[in-house]
Amino acid sequence: MLPALRLMTCALLTFFTTLSHASQCPDWSHARASSEITALQQQIASWDDSYHRQGLSQIPDELYDQSRQKLNDWRSCFAVSTPQANPLKTATGPLAHPVPHTGVNKLADEKDVKAWLKGRTDLWIQPKVDGVAVTLVYDEGRLVQAISRGDGTQGQDWTPQARLIKAIPQQLPQPDSLILQGELYWRLTDHVQAASGSVNARSKVAGMLARQTISPQQADAIGLFVWDWPDGPADMAQRLAGLQAMGFNHSVAYTHPLENHAQAADWREHWYRNPLPFATDGVIMRQGQRPPAQRWQASAPYWIAAWKHPYAQALAEVRKVHFNIGRTGKIAPVLELTPVRLDDRTVSRISAGSLSRWEKLDIRPGDHIAVSLAGLTIPRLDGVVSRAAERAEMSVPHASDYHESSCWQAAPGCESQFRARLVWLSGKKGLALPGVGPGTWDKLIESGHISGLLDWMTLNHAELANIPGLAERSSDKLLDSLQTARERPFQTWLKAIGLPPAGNAKLPDNWHDLAERSVEQWQAEPGIGPGRAAKLRAFFQDPHVQALSQQLQAQGISGFK
């Protein structure tokens, strides 16, 4: 299997036309562009060093690939001509590979896969094993050297570790001198990539090989997948037969002839969703015929390409941060994103959870985040991938300003919570007013007809008919719907204006008795503890709530008289 390493260059990434670039290019000055491009280049360089030199993956491959594609797009947008740094520059070692390790061209989508396959013959497909690449050198059938992939030209001496790994034959059946390239992987039992992901399998192997000594148990947990025999027969079928004769059965079992895109898609799906003894991150498609090993270079060749698994995580750019304040004062940050595709869904908005989580992550417009689907349906924020070099200033609400007793009026700073109170009031858990939803309240607020929670109760047909966006027929229906509120029972009205949960308490049907209750009296009710009792007492003593009760009394609502 080809190395699961990130040897990517700008030439290997998907290029966009000038028109598509124009639609996707950020609206930055050249100074801002230079700053942002430099920051992302430095972040990627840090990931490269950790991954290739230390064997530690700080970021999933799919997010790395998307980040590098983003960098490539920005460089193209702003005509950056300086060459990008080699991702493997810090991974070199003292030993030269007898045959360089090539990289792999990662195809972006099915369109690219079809284009790559077009006109090619003698094609084969393998799973892209997620491990660490190695060169094995045999002299007269005896293992004499194991070299890490390094920068593709030179790597580290892994021979001492290789002596302990049973999956690496120390002596071949025949006294042949040859060179093999393959993947050392962490053995897994019935591993389904779609369900379990990569489970840090590559990092485990890299960590073992970075040690001076490894235990027999650790060595036994490492497997070998030979994916090339550079100086072997020119014919692929003969190479596979030779590898099988040497005992490398995986090479034969997981290498299949490939005729078209449909077959490639089937194998990719099969290996993604069915049990395998190793983690994978896609498939490798290769031509059986290739240049002689003497011409190989440490760069992606034309005869090999990778088609990665579907993204489990997408890289999304944050466009705006909204702070939605619920009716009880809870602040919920929501991120507005440049739309991204995950599975068959388009994600353009995502919750950041609580205000404290947002503050910890410090997500600003221009940052890039990782997004996945929880339960395959609900967009989920997994974390920050990279930050904008220029940090946007933001107006952030203070948690102490919003609570259960705040924002009963449409005052500045109260827009979100006041609107949430209205939506709750007309919703299924409140008065259940037919056809009255968020859009209705927005029109009434924007037209200046509502500034308090119950102002709508005094609106008449003429006032509604003059509201922009409400035709005469619509205003008639709205008025009829609003009038049904008068028929709702007292208990329903209590919930609609925000009564805290009262458990199984039996509530009297009049406001006066409830307003007179003490904390101790509330606590005597079944299912009500000290905290809830205090909230109920505070609710009925709140001046804003008392004012609402007086309005409802004036409107003749049952229970408030």
UniProtKB/Swiss-Prot annotation:
The active site is at K128. Keywords: DNA damage, DNA repair, DNA replication, Ligase, NAD. Pfam families: DNA_ligase_aden (PF01653), DNA_ligase_OB (PF03120). The keyword Transcription regulation does not apply. It catalyses: NAD(+) + (deoxyribonucleotide)n-3'-hydroxyl + 5'-phospho-(deoxyribonucleotide)m = (deoxyribonucleotide)n+m + AMP + beta-nicotinamide D-nucleotide. The keyword Coiled coil does not apply. GO terms for biological process: DNA repair; DNA replication. Catalyzes the formation of phosphodiester linkages between 5'-phosphoryl and 3'-hydroxyl groups in double-stranded DNA using NAD as a coenzyme and as the energy source for the reaction. NCBIfam families: PRK08097.1 (NF005987). HAMAP family: DNA_ligase_B. This is DNA ligase B. The lineage of its organism: Bacteria, Pseudomonadati, Pseudomonadota, Gammaproteobacteria, Pseudomonadales. The gene is ligB.
